[in-house]
Amino acid sequence: MNKRDYMNTSVQEPPLDYSFRSIHVIQDLVNEEPRTGLRPLKRSKSGKSLTQSLWLNNNVLNDLRDFNQVASQLLEHPENLAWIDLSFNDLTSIDPVLTTFFNLSVLYLHGNSIQRLGEVNKLAVLPRLRSLTLHGNPMEEEKGYRQYVLCTLSRITTFDFAGVTKADRTTAEVWKRMNIKPKKAWIKRNTL
């Protein structure tokens, strides 16, 4: 199967689903059997999954150490991951490893322990990210939570399972002008 055929078929493939497995560390995925759904997973000749979705929700992960290596062991084309579900784990930050998946369009991080709203800045490099969840994290309690995320990630069309409207965008822009100070340009003055 060539790469173009793979891209056309894997979008409809069921996810590689490791949800509700009490997984503590990413490396455990290699020895764990994924959950089975109504449709069987398609595999490559090498035995790797032909999907673009990886579900790790409802586990006890507190970091994503070795995520890239494990994804490469499980998926035929890990670089094509489009959907990662890490909801309901024990993550305290947004691991930069997630920013290496440039085809990521759906990222679920709700129900974790992410404290700092500034963690969202890391996701700004993902050009295809359209759907993001962060509710149920301590950061949700910060003033301007929704507006900050929408300002930082202007391509998002769905946030916390709600569509982003034009009014949301306008409110976020007004909030940004009122709350985020622009960086001042330093001008070196000539000394005579």
From Swiss-Prot:
InterPro entries: Leu-rich_rpt, LRR_dom_sf. It is found in: Cytoplasm. Residues 137-175 form the LRRCT domain. It comes from the Eukaryota. LRR repeats lie at residues 49-71, 80-101, 103-124. Keywords: Cytoplasm, Leucine-rich repeat, Repeat. GO terms for cellular component: axoneme. Pfam families: LRR_9. PANTHER family: LEUCINE-RICH REPEAT-CONTAINING PROTEIN 51 (PTHR46545:SF1). LRRC51 and TOMT were originally considered as alternative reading frames, LRTOMT1 and LRTOMT2 of the same LRTOMT gene in primates. This is Leucine-rich repeat-containing protein 51. The lineage of its organism: Eukaryota, Metazoa, Chordata, Craniata, Vertebrata. The gene is LRRC51.
